[in-house]
């Protein structure tokens, strides 16, 4: 079985919230795809409930695209501690952390229910499992802790 990088990461050494560049892959024509670890809560100490995480996912899908070029996808980890962000090209972890911080600020302080995309039976595979209240509260908690652009030391972005 292929080795998966995220399963070799020592989850006891990281200091969430943080942004970490996992890998940059190069395609046959030279195109680069970057994979980032957007870790919102400390592994094995906390997990975001599914309804809040689901709503954050739907909001980040648009908000990160507004702030970063080349966003392909932002998908939650099964452990519910954060997200994979996949982009075309390369962004610094500082740039990604600032985009994440700005997105979470919008979720925490500006977003209304009508701003959340994909909350109907037609547009979401689990449309009943959303909570804007939870998304806002978790976003505030993460912002209060500060988002670091380094996974193993706290270097909080402005």
Curated annotation (Swiss-Prot):
Enzymatic reactions: S-(5-deoxy-D-ribos-5-yl)-L-homocysteine = (S)-4,5-dihydroxypentane-2,3-dione + L-homocysteine
Segments passing through the bilayer: none
InterPro entries linked to this entry: LuxS_sf, Metalloenz_LuxS/M16, S-ribosylhomocysteinase
Details of cofactor binding: Binds 1 Fe cation per subunit.
Keyword terms of this UniProt record: Autoinducer synthesis, Iron, Lyase, Metal-binding, Quorum sensing
UniProt-listed GO biological process terms: quorum sensing
One MF annotation (Gene Ontology) recorded for this entry: S-ribosylhomocysteine lyase activity
Cofactor: Fe cation
Pfam families recorded: LuxS
Similarity comment: Belongs to the LuxS family.
Subunit structure: Homodimer.
Role noted for this protein: Involved in the synthesis of autoinducer 2 (AI-2) which is secreted by bacteria and is used to communicate both the cell density and the metabolic potential of the environment. The regulation of gene expression in response to changes in cell density is called quorum sensing. Catalyzes the transformation of S-ribosylhomocysteine (RHC) to homocysteine (HC) and 4,5-dihydroxy-2,3-pentadione (DPD).
Name assigned to this protein: S-ribosylhomocysteine lyase
Organism, scientific name: Limosilactobacillus reuteri (strain DSM 20016) (Lactobacillus reuteri)
């Amino acid at each position: 079985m292929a080795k998966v990088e995220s399963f070799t990461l020592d989850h006891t050494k990281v200091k969430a919230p943080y942004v970490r560049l996992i890998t940059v892959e190069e395609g046959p024509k030279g195109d680069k795809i970057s994979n980032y670890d957007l870790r919102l809560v400390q592994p094995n100490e906390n997990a975001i409930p599914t309804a809040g995480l689901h709503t954050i996912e739907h909001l980040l899908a648009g908000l990160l695209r507004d702030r970063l070029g080349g966003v392909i996808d932002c998908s939650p980890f099964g452990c519910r501690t954060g997200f994979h962000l996949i982009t075309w090209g390369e962004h610094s972890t500082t740039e990604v952390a600032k985009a994440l911080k700005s997105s979470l600020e919008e979720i925490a302080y500006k977003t209304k229910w009508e701003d959340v995309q994909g909350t109907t039976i037609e547009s979401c595979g689990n449309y009943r499992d959303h909570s804007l209240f939870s998304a806002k509260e978790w976003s505030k908690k993460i912002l209060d802790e500060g988002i670091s652009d380094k996974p193993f030391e706290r270097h909080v972005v402005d």
